[in-house]
């Protein structure tokens, strides 16, 4: 029998590659024991990039979620790992050194064992400091090679990076094939090169299933020494996500590898529970197109997880481009026409901006440059005339060293615009920030939290954390969720049917008198404007719902009927209403 292969369930990435949000703390705590019961996973990806930010956007505390999800795995010896964007840590832009260092201390205390550190440019300068801080914080540093196909991304290129990372203290290497475009034979050779030189180094393969190469890649890397394979489970496996663990284990077992058995009863429970989370609310933010694989992405190399946002961008751009074409007397473009044009433009742009690996955030920059080029060429302005500072920052070297050469046209354009190229170590441009955030927390009377985790959260995601603390994030989220639900219903119902459906389980709150409506009153010294409540707000029976200023100058208190959840508002703060008008609808809790 061949060597033993272990498996990781990338539960965080399953959701990130499918939609906008992550499960709540209670949902994660509910499914963790079932994942353990499956018996086939030695690792689980519990948190990391995007996980914490979208928790805050949903009005939830990510620290509570991480602790609740990691704890059951810690108790049984299943290792937990997180995604770490190196210089950018958990967000999309650079993070000061002191905040990055604090992250590893906090995450280790919360129960995260391994940090997968990657840099979108494969610039080791953005990774190596994190290796040191991870070890100091008590975590295992696993360093990633961002896989792509280009003339500069050779076996020697990747081996040179692996050499530097291992010399700096990396204990594991991940082959991170985010777009799933790594050629299987190439990945097998790379795995063998690393294993032959560093037999003690653990190699973990992470490949998305988008263009259909990932199963062949898994077989190649395992036959050449890989130790651990990232997998998914239904209903979020395949498509633009990851291969399903059932298929991977079946393939490797028949190849002669030692693999664990799957408790299929537990698998079906985890499958049903994940579907339950989708049905409850997460599915309203999942693009159905992410369930579809596409070989079209092999040519341009863009990650499949971008397809949803990319198609939305194309939809808006198509109308603008077709308006221009109509004025010129040219034939309009279909979505398919425009998609192929975009893929072709990415293939044109990518080498000219130096072949940055097409992973977050550089895949977005290359896509956006290409999309803007399509528009400006239709306008007769040529290419590269609509690039923002983020796009230029990548080209100029402000995010790290670009693997290839920048096209002379762009070098000349940068000079004309007074932009300067740099090879500076990006993290040295940042100043420490924790003292400023401590001052802000002290002034607001906010606790630093267990192991300084709340301080870390503010420092990592300042805007989102402030909105979370004020309650605005939860209000915004519930309103977005209601809009998403209405949109889904509205796609199959007439407006009248939609209103009837929404109000079937709801009580109408009716104005008892005519007058002017007031949803709330502000206390002395409050500077926030009074506004109507957020959709989803909970009321108890008899609560004051709103107030009406009657024509005779007295306020009439309107009670919240039998209580429940606010589902629709028909009257804004300060508006005039008539007696008998419906102010809002409250949906009672199920008996």
Task: Provide a role label for each language-model segment.
Residues 1-18, 66-71:
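N-terminal amphipathic alpha-helix/helix-capping segment at the start of soluble metabolic enzymes
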Residues 33, 48-163, 180-183:
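Active-site beta->alpha loop and helix N-cap motifs at the rims of alpha/beta catalytic domains
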Residues 153-165, 211-227:
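Catalytic cores of alpha/beta
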Residues 36-54, 292-297, 301-507:
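Terminal or standalone catalytic/regulatory effector modules within metabolic enzymes
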Residues 237-262:
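C-terminal helical cap(s) of enzyme catalytic domains, especially alpha/beta-barrels
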Residues 117, 177, 224-243:
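Glycine-rich phosphate-binding active-site loops on the catalytic face of alpha/beta enzymes
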Residues 5-13, 42-46, 78-85, 115-117, ...:
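Hydrophobic faces of well-ordered beta-strands that scaffold small-molecule active sites
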Residues 493-547, 554-557, 563, 568:
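Acidic, low-complexity mobile loops and tails
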């Amino acid at each position: 029998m061949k060597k033993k292969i272990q498996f990781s369930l990338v539960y965080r990435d399953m959701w990130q590659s499918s939609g906008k949000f992550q499960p709540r703390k209670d949902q994660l705590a509910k499914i963790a024991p079932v994942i353990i019961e499956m018996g086939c996973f030695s690792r689980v990806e519990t948190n990391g990039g995007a996980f914490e930010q979208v928790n805050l956007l949903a009005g939830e505390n990510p620290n509570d979620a991480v602790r609740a999800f990691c704890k059951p795995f810690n108790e049984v010896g299943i290792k937990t790992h997180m995604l770490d964007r190196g210089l950018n840590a958990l967000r999309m832009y650079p993070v000061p050194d002191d905040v990055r260092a604090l992250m590893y201390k906090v995450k280790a205390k919360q129960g995260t064992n391994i940090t997968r550190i990657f840099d979108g440019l494969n610039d080791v300068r953005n990774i190596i400091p994190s290796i040191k801080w991870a070890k100091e914080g008590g975590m295992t540093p696993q360093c990633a090679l961002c896989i792509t196909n280009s003339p500069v991304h050779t076996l020697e290129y990747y081996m040179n990076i692996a050499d530097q990372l291992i010399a700096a203290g990396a204990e594991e290497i991940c082959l991170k094939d985010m777009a799933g475009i790594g050629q299987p034979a190439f990945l097998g050779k790379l795995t063998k090169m690393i294993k032959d030189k560093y037999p003690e180094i653990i190699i973990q393969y992470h490949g998305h299933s988008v263009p259909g190469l990932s199963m062949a890649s898994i077989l190649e890397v395992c036959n050449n020494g890989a130790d651990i394979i990232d997998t998914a489970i239904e209903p979020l496996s395949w498509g633009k996500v990851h291969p399903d663990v059932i298929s991977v284990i079946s393939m490797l077992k028949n190849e002669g590898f030692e693999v664990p058995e799957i408790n299929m009863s537990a698998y079906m429970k985890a499958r049903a529970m994940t579907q339950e989370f989708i049905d409850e609310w997460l599915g309203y933010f999942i693009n159905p197109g992410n369930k579809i694989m596409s070989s079209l992405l092999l040519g341009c190399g863009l990650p499949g997880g971008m397809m949803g946002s990319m198609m939305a961008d194309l939809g808006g751009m198509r109308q603008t481009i077709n308006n221009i074409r109509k004025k010129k007397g040219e034939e309009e473009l279909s979505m398919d026409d425009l998609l192929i044009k975009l893929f072709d433009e990415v293939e044109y742009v990518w080498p000219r901006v130096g072949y940055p690996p097409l992973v977050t955030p550089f895949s977005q920059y290359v896509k956006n440059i290409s999309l803007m080029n399509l528009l400006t060429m239709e306008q007769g302005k040529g290419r590269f005339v609509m690039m923002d500072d983020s796009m230029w920052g990548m080209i100029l070297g402000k995010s790290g060293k670009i693997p290839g050469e920048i096209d002379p046209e762009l070098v000349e354009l940068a000079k004309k615009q007074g932009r300067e190229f740099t090879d500076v170590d990006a993290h040295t441009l940042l100043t420490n920030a924790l003292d400023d955030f401590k001052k802000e927390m002290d002034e607001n009377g906010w606790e630093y939290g267990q192991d300084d985790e709340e301080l870390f959260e503010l420092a990592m995601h300042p805007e989102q954390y402030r909105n979370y603390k004020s309650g605005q994030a939860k209000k915004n989220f519930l309103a977005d969720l209601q809009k998403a639900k209405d949109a889904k219903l509205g796609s199959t119902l007439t407006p009248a049917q939609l209103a009837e459906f929404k109000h079937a389980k709801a009580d109408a709150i009716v104005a008892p008198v005519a007058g002017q409506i007031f949803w709330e009153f502000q206390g002395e010294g409050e500077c926030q404007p009074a506004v109507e409540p957020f959709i989803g707000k909970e009321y108890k029976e008899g609560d004051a719902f709103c107030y009406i200023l009657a024509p005779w100058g007295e306020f009439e208190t309107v009670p919240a009927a039998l209580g429940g959840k606010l589902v629709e508002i028909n009257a804004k703060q300060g508006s005039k209403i008539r007696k008998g008008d419906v102010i809002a609808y409250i949906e009672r809790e199920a008996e």
